[in-house]
């Protein structure tokens, strides 16, 4: 009905109707924008912006190896969506769980292509990656490390869902990215998707709206509220107040990048957001990360960026979900923040302190967030988190009970 209203009054070309945030994507001639804005039911018009990619020592820095040794957790049973340029399903580190092609245990259990095949929504599209960025991220989260096993992901026995929203050049429209995000929510029960990694971002393009009003940020928050722990890269702009859409969304876990010496990487974007919200939430190693090199079959390559930090943190979430499948996305965020090693926010390794240095421990700052992710404490706290519920009601009476006594429960 909304589409009919638009097409009958202006020359509107429909792309997609979103259900999670009550929005429609499409195109309209510039000269019809004012007319469009006056149609009944039109609350806001946004420019369809462009999102782009934002470019094993991490396991040692964050204590992931200790998890394998002390608990045996390896991500088994957890599923993470990689919302990116795609995933190379032919790479030996991503083709199956046990690296034995004679067994039926795929690593990638579903794939949706919002760029070139959006009509195929059942998840059965053959996985591919015509850029390479998404495969590198997928390997960081859950690659097995085959054939040499020198560079496995954080959760090597977790499974993946590929959601291609960026093209072969590494960019995509807000509308296309949102289509992939909504598909992920709609299929979360079908494929048991509990976490998602989005190593992409852009800046607020509409001066008269805050980032929270941008549809892609609202969609990100809806993903979290629908049970998916969403990790988003802070960006690589290297300066403060430059965390843009969708990393500026309130409910997501925004990830900054560390060098291997655990200092903030020189490129890692810093908060606050446009609204003054402190971001990022946490920091993870993102420099010189070795992971899958797409379309090589067996190769690995080094990349740096908050793009590389984000899937690493998502891999830790997969370990936490294995330890306790009852966790909510907010449990994941809170535990990761509370167990992080606090870092004072000296900018880019400079000697001068920044204003937040005097704040108490575990208060989030705009450089490191709550600090460096500590995987083992996070997983142990996740495992020990117990939800207690009781239907019992204790009623204390100050008056002796007689045959005529009554208890009123209001």
Where do the protein language model's features map onto the residues?
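Subtilisin-like serine protease catalytic core
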Residues: 68-112, 118-175, 189-195, 225, ...
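Acidic, glycine-anchored loop motifs typical of Ca2+
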Residues: 99-104, 187, 399, 405-408
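Substrate-binding/access-modulating region of protease and related hydrolase catalytic domains
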Residues: 3, 74-76, 144-148, 165-251, ...
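Autoinhibitory propeptides
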Residues: 3-76, 95-98
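Extracellular S/T/G-rich loop segment that most often corresponds to the catalytic His/Ser-adjacent loop
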Residues: 106-117, 244-322, 326, 377
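C-terminal subdomain of the subtilisin-like protease fold in secreted/lumenal serine endopeptidases
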Residues: 193-199, 322-409
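Active-site-proximal beta-strand/loop segments in catalytic clefts of secreted hydrolases
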Residues: 28-29, 47-50, 81-86, 112, ...
């Amino acid at each position: 009905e909304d589409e009919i209203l638009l097409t009958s009054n202006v020359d509107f070309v429909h792309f997609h109707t979103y259900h999670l945030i009550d929005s429609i994507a499409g195109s309209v001639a510039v000269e019809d924008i004012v007319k469009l804005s006056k149609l009944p039911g039109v609350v806001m018009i946004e420019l369809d912006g462009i999102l782009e990619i934002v470019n094993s020592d991490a396991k040692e820095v964050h204590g992931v190896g200790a998890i394998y040794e002390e608990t045996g957790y390896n991500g088994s049973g957890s599923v993470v969506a990689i919302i990116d340029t795609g995933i190379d399903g032919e790479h030996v580190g991503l083709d199956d769980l046990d690296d034995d092609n004679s067994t039926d245990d795929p690593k990638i259990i579903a794939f949706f292509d919002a760029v070139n095949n959006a009509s195929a929504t059942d998840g059965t599209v053959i996985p591919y990656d015509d850029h390479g960025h998404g495969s590198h991220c997928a390997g960081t989260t859950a690659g097995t490390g085959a054939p040499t096993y020198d560079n496995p992901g954080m959760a090597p026995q977790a499974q993946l869902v590929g959601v291609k929203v960026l093209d072969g050049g590494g960019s995509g429209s807000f509308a296309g990215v949102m289509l992939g995000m909504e598909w992920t929510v709609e299929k979360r029960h079908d494929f048991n998707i509990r976490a998602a990694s989005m190593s992409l971002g852009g800046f607020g393009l509409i001066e008269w709206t805050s980032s929270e009003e941008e549809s892609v940020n609202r969609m990100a928050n809806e993903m979290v509220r629908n049970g998916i722990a969403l990790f988003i890269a802070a960006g690589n702009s290297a300066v403060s107040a430059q965390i843009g859409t969708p990393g500026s969304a309130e409910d997501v876990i925004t990830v900054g990048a560390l060098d291997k010496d655990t200092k903030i990487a020189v490129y890692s974007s810093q908060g606050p957001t446009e609204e003054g919200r402190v971001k990022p939430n946490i920091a993870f190693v993102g420099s010189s990360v070795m992971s899958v090199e797409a379309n090589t079959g067996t190769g690995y390559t080094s990349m740096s960026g908050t793009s590389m930090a984000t899937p690493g943190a998502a891999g830790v979430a997969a370990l936490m979900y294995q330890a306790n499948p009852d966790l909510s996305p907010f449990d994941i965020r809170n535990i990761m923040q509370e167990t992080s090693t606090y870092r004072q926010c000296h900018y880019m390794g400079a000697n001068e302190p920044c204003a937040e240095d005097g704040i108490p421990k575990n208060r989030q700052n705009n450089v490191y967030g709550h600090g460096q992710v500590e995987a083992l404490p996070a997983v142990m706290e996740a495992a020990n988190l117990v939800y207690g519920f009781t239907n019992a009601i204790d009623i204390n009476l100050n008056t002796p009970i007689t045959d005529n006594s009554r208890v009123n429960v209001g």
